[in-house]
Amino acid sequence: MYKTIIMPVDVFEMELSDKAIRHAEFLAQDDGVIHLLHVLPGSASLSLHRFAADVRRFEEHLQHEAEERLQTMVSHFTIDPSRIKQHVRFGSVRDEVNELAKELDADVVVIGSRNPSISTHLLGSNASSVIRHANLPVLVVR
């Protein structure tokens, strides 16, 4: 059905992603590839160089932790693990989803979303931000 599917996930909220997994698998059918994407917040440019090494070490730790959790998430899928790719990036979810979509010439984004609340309506959420700025179809799973 779809060849290249991007699935933004929060590795620290597995239950939210679990809801979207079955939908992504269905869309992938027999030969589609699912690209799991976890986005870590980018650090602001630091003018205090003495802290830069500490920030880099912390970012490396976060990236390693995210990669391990993504690997664990692969076991939640029923499709062949070779059809699931993992990406960890720094930045905003919206921008990184769009960048990866462009790099991969992706067909669709599948993203889990919480049930709406007053805070997500007022402040926005990753899912709503991705929807507003994506240049490809987005399936939101609740």
Swiss-Prot record:
PANTHER family attached to this UniProt entry: STRESS RESPONSE PROTEIN NHAX, UNIVERSAL STRESS PROTEIN UP12
Family matches, as InterPro entries: Rossmann-like_a/b/a_fold (IPR014729), Universal_stress_UspA (IPR006015), UspA (IPR006016)
Source organism phylogeny: Bacteria, Pseudomonadati, Pseudomonadota, Gammaproteobacteria, Enterobacterales
SUPFAM superfamilies documented for this protein: Adenine nucleotide alpha hydrolases-like
Family, as annotated: Belongs to the universal stress protein A family.
Gene3D superfamilies: HUPs
Protein name: Universal stress protein G
A Pfam cross-reference name: Usp
NCBIfam families documented for this protein: PRK15456.1 (NF012000)
Residue ranges of coiled coil: none
